[in-house]
Amino acid sequence: MSIVKEFREFIARGNVVDLAVGVIIGAAFNGIVKSLVDGVIMPPIGLVTGGLDFSKLQWVLKPEDPVTEAVELVAIQYGAFINTVIQFLIVAVVVFLLVKLVNHIRRADAAEPAPEAPAAPTPEERLLTEIRDLLAKPATVTAAPKAAAAPVAKPKTKPKA
C-alpha cells in the first residue's frame, strides 16, 4: 500500500484516538512548524517565484487612506492562508507517521504467535517411554504357575514281522 493511499485513508477516517493524537501533536509543534514554514520553507519558494513573499499576499477590497487614516485597509490575506495550509500539511504528515508507527507496533504485538502445543510423540518416543516406565518399576519375580502336565501319548510301533 502506498504512503499516499495510506495518508488519504488516515485523513478520511474518523478515529477518536487519531484525532486526539493530532490535536496534541499539532498544539505541541505549532511554534516549531510555524518557524519551519516561515523561515525555512517559504523563502526558497519565494525565491523560485521571483521574490514573492506569501505572507504579504492579499486582495485589497477597500484601500486604506494614508492621509486621514480614518479608513482602515480591508483585504483578504490569502498568503497567510497559504502559509497556514502548509503548516497544517506538515503537522498532518507528522501525525500520520506517528499513528502509522503506533499501528505497526500494535500489529506486531497482536501477531505474536501463541505458544505451540507440544507435538504428539512419535512411535519411537512412545516405545522408549514404555521401556523407561517398565525399567522404573521395582523388579518383582513371580513364579509362573505350573501347567498340569498332559499325558504324553506313546507312539504306536508296528510289530516286526
UniProtKB/Swiss-Prot annotation:
Q: What is its main location?
A: membrane
Q: Which domain of life is it from?
A: Bacteria
Keywords on record: Cell inner membrane, Cell membrane, Ion channel, Ion transport, Membrane, Transmembrane, Transmembrane helix, Transport
What GO cellular-component annotations does this UniProt entry give? plasma membrane
Q: Which Pfam families match?
A: MscL
Which terms in the Gene Ontology molecular function aspect does this entry carry?
mechanosensitive monoatomic ion channel activity
Instruction: Map out region (Disordered) in residue numbers.
Output: 142-161
Q: Name the coiled-coil region(s).
A: none
Annotated membrane topology: Multi-pass membrane protein
Q: Where is it localised?
A: Cell inner membrane
Q: Does the keyword Ion transport apply?
A: yes
Q: Which family does it belong to?
A: Belongs to the MscL family.
NCBIfam families linked:
mscL (TIGR00220), PRK00567.1-4 (NF001843)
Function of the protein: Channel that opens in response to stretch forces in the membrane lipid bilayer. May participate in the regulation of osmotic pressure changes within the cell.
Self-association state and partner proteins as the record states: Homopentamer.
Q: What is this protein called?
A: Large-conductance mechanosensitive channel
Species annotation: Caulobacter sp. (strain K31)
